[in-house]
């Protein structure tokens, strides 16, 4: 079980992440609104601007203040560390 830091000390299990997307498009905003009404939205931005939306295999949506590229690099970096050890 590999935990990935998504900002401000918040962690997500990397194997549970299905997608990391940018929140800027209208369909994603509707998707977030629907998740909020279903109580499946987790806001880990601490009041900062949402820069990445993480979709988990459980159907939950996690908002992060980090860029999608940063989170993806942390996941990739973690995989490389596991391979080398």
UniProtKB/Swiss-Prot annotation:
Coiled-coil boundaries: none
Disulfide bond sites: none
Protein origin, superkingdom: Bacteria
InterPro entries linked to this entry: RemA-like (IPR007169)
Family from the record: Belongs to the RemA family.
PANTHER family: REGULATORY PROTEIN SSL2874-RELATED (PTHR38449:SF1), REGULATORY PROTEIN TM_1690-RELATED (PTHR38449)
Name of the featured protein: Putative regulatory protein Dtur_1444
Protein's organism: Dictyoglomus turgidum (strain DSM 6724 / Z-1310)
Species lineage: Bacteria, Pseudomonadati, Dictyoglomota, Dictyoglomia, Dictyoglomales
